[in-house]
Amino acid sequence: MKLYNSASRKKEDFVPNHPDIVKMYTCGPTVYHFAHIGNLRSYIMEDVLEKYLRYAGYNVKRVMNITDVGHLTSDADEGEDKMLKGAKREHKSVMEIAKFYTDAFFSDCKKLNIKTPDVVEPATNCIDEYIKIITKLMDTGYAYFAGGNVYFDTSKLERYYIFNDFNADDLDVGVREGVEEDVNKRNKNDFVLWFTKSKFEDQALKWDSPWGVGYPGWHIECSGISMKHLGEDLDIHCGGIDNAFPHHTNEIAQSESYLGHKWCNYWMHVLHLNTNSGKMSKSKGEFLTVSLLEDKGYDPLAYRLFCLQSHYRKSLVFSWENLDNAQGTYNKLINRIAALKPAGEAVDEDAVAALKSKFTAALDNDLNTSLAVTALYDVLKYDTNDDTKLAVIADFDRVLSLSLIEKADARRAELKKQAVSGTSEFTVISESGESDAGIEALLKARANAKKAKNFAEADRIRDELKAQGIEVTDIPNGAKWKRI
């Protein structure tokens, strides 16, 4: 298995630190607002990664934080705590805001079939861990106290910019409009490890510390939570491209200065979901939620499929037209699987091996989900019995998590119910997924002839299709066809 490592800027063979476990850390949401579908693209990719590692036989422990304090509006050290901003917006307490939007986040994840990580830790639970790390950084000269805050001194590092090949447009960093720069820093890139009350008098959440009553910076939270649950080394750290700088850069700086050795081996970043006006962003007030997609009639799993059809290291352009296409593709996929007829036949193990080789080759190549979806379509076209196809589809869906078998079973039951009531519409399914209006018209004409008991005409149409190299199979309330 090869993964693209953002730190080395190349694909590398994946070799975990320990043979018995893969340690995986995911930057979780800042729970001051709903997650937008661009945020959720990252969590979909991370979900696929975890599930594929398990599929490949690894034992995985995945940890994710919930940021409920310390994440400022600049994404660096300037501005207001986002949690306080959310509380003011909705006239609620910070903890009320945190609980509501944490619950909303996991509700969205459930709709998208995103597995809950093994450990989910709110940042406010780990204050002692942050103080322990900061104290050692102060003692070893990597941190200093100024203006009421504790800062990490980036001038002490031989190398600070780890991900500096990213374009500025990709990273979207810099001081945002209306945000004042911190004049207490010795160096431009220094960052806050601990804020005291001297910074924000109205900060809602504060704790005692050796440096005064205050609260942790955003970056120290992920280091502390990761070390608490995963120890002093880490295999994979994931996040959106926005996290690469300054957040992940600062995590590496403080963690490796504290530990005295390399902290994480593989860094993986998901690129933006863009709209016609640019990157989807809560700070700009331009974002779409899973609930909004549902209100417009879309299945959240159609959005998951939309994400899987593109590689995670490519920017993905969202439009309603593109989502319409994904929903149509998803519906057709479910219909094609529903047209398969389980008959209790033996599974063809040779076919399984051939089909799985394409699927695993795709995902072994830096999680190429686009080719993995193509491998799924190959199953439907493969010359083997339907029981084998259904078994392989169920196997692939352990990773893709599109609820393919469940949705197909429901569709099959719906068609049978419609057949009994006589309210069903005739469904035409192409086994290859292609669309041909002429063939569909002939199949519907044949169905009408059969309904009128004009079997001679129905047979004539079947013969006409056969002469065109089309094989027809009748299914409940429809027909499926393929070229032979």
Give the positions of each predicted feature:
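Short, glycine/charge-rich beta-strand/loop segments that flank catalytic centers
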Residues: 63-69, 98-105, 115-130, 148-157
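N-terminal, positively charged nucleic-acid-binding surface of large information/translation enzymes
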Residues: 8, 17-113, 477-481
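Anion (oxyanion) recognition and catalysis
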Residues: 54, 138, 466
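Short, well-structured beta-strand/strand-turn elements
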Residues: 59-61, 141-147, 383, 471-473
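Alpha-helical recognition segments enriched in aromatics with Gly/Pro capping
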Residues: 1-32, 47, 107, 127-341
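Structural preference for alpha-helix termini/caps and helix-kink/transition segments
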Residues: 279-281, 287-484
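The substrate-binding groove and active-site-proximal loops of carbohydrate-active enzymes
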Residues: 87-93, 119-124, 212, 240
